């Protein structure tokens, strides 16, 4: 029987040291403006955010920054701040008077369907000690390179200054190398890659990383950062189909949709990746999944799929797990005989182990155990 295996990238194919380093560099940029030596959250704290469904550093950075500033302003309630983040950081630094919080806790808030976590926190009224204009500038438009100062700075560190300017046609605001190139490393060996490339196994990337548009289209790549493609090249899987954030953004732009409603845990993400894996065509997968999103029917490329196959997903968080479980159910309701397997990869992380245990998802600490455990 054919096996489709959907592969997350960060925490599954690569150790995402680049994104974590870019996160810390972005936070420390603002810390420096405040006159502080550093501002860091330990990895387990960041893993707890992922456990809550906050997977992207584009959300983590504004939420962490807002948490720090809200705590400071709760102890400086009458401090007036400009709405520009850099200017606000300088002004906050002038008024610290030696105060620094010992423990920072990001508030709980309800997620809003189709909305990114940072913006959901804003809608929920979190960080009320921060003046509204500044709060909006921190938390809103978290994927807009022109409007989000945190995203724009983070992308400098992820891509490097030169590629940042080439990708977005914007002048570099800081000079830096690409942390993706200097800090990411592969989790898979040649032996693991060979097991994944066996006959009757069909692979596709399933990631929230930015990416180029679908490889079958010939439109401009302006604003599309090829970060997912960089990772697949690093692990020796550059040729497999990929459904990443940039691909979903492209589909959303073509159809007047919100990309946030298409990305995992939305089943659109896994449906598109499943079609792409079996057909080798990213754009066909995206269009077919987009049709389901808009009509509730599996049309187009789904007609060309085998009626029976196994659907695996390997994830380090629950977003892709939920996307794939729902996609499998949609396929079965449409007459496909699909057996769904959700596999967690923890790399020994306590919070990831707890998350998968609570969700009843089988998990493994490393790829060697995973390959043996699922019988590949």
Where are these regions (language model features)?
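Pocket-edge positions in alpha/beta enzyme catalytic cores
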Residues: 46-49, 53, 261-262, 362
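Phosphate/oxyanion-binding active-site loops and adjacent basic polyanion-contact surfaces
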Residues: 15-19, 23, 53-57, 180-185, ...
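Active-site neighborhood of HAD-like aspartate-dependent phosphohydrolases
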Residues: 1-46, 52-55, 59-62, 66-70, ...
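Surface-exposed alpha-helical segments enriched in charged/polar residues
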Residues: 28, 66, 190-197, 275, ...
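Substrate-recognition element of Asp-dependent hydrolases with the DxDx(T/V) motif
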Residues: 5, 12-13, 97-105, 109-251
């Amino acid at each position: 029987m054919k096996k489709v295996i959907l592969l997350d990238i960060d925490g599954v194919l690569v150790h995402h040291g680049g994104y974590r380093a870019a996160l810390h560099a972005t936070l420390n940029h603002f810390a420096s403006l405040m006159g502080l030596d550093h501002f860091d959250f330990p990895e387990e704290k960041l893993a707890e955010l992922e456990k809550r469904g906050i997977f992207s550093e584009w959300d983590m950075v504004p939420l962490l920054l807002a948490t720090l500033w809200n705590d400071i302003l709760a102890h400086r309630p009458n401090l007036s701040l400009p709405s520009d983040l850099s200017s606000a950081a300088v002004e906050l630094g002038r008024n610290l008077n030696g105060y620094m919080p010992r423990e920072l806790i990001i508030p709980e808030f309800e997620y809003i369907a189709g909305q990114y976590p940072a913006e959901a926190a804003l809608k929920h009224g979190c960080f009320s000690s921060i003046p509204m204009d500044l709060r909006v500038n921190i938390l809103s438009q978290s994927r807009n390179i022109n409007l989000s100062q945190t995203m724009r700075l983070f992308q400098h560190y992820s891509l490097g200054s030169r590629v940042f300017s080439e990708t977005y046609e914007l002048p570099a605001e800081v000079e830096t190398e690409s942390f993706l190139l200097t800090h990411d490393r592969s989790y898979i060996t040649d032996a693991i890659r060979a097991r994944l490339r066996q006959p009757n196994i069909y692979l596709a990337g399933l990631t929230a990383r930015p990416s180029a548009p679908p490889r079958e289209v010939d439109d401009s790549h302006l604003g599309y950062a090829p970060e997912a493609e960089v990772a697949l090249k690093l692990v020796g899987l550059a040729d497999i189909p990929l459904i990443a954030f940039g691909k979903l953004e492209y589909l959303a732009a073509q159809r007047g949709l919100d990309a946030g409603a298409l990305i995992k845990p939305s089943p659109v993400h896994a449906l598109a990746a499943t079609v792409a894996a079996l057909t080798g065509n990213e754009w066909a997968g995206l269009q077919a999944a987009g049709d389901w999103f808009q009509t509730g029917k599996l049309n187009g490329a789904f007609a060309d799929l085998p009626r029976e196959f196994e659907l695996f997903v390997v994830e380090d968080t629950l977003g892709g797990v939920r996307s794939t479980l729902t996609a499998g159910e949609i396929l079965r309701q449409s007459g496909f005989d699909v057996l769904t397997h959700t596999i967690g990869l923890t790399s020994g992380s306590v919070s990831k182990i707890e998350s998968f245990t609570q969700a009843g998802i089988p998990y493994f600490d490393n790829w060697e155990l995973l390959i043996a455990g699922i019988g590949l």
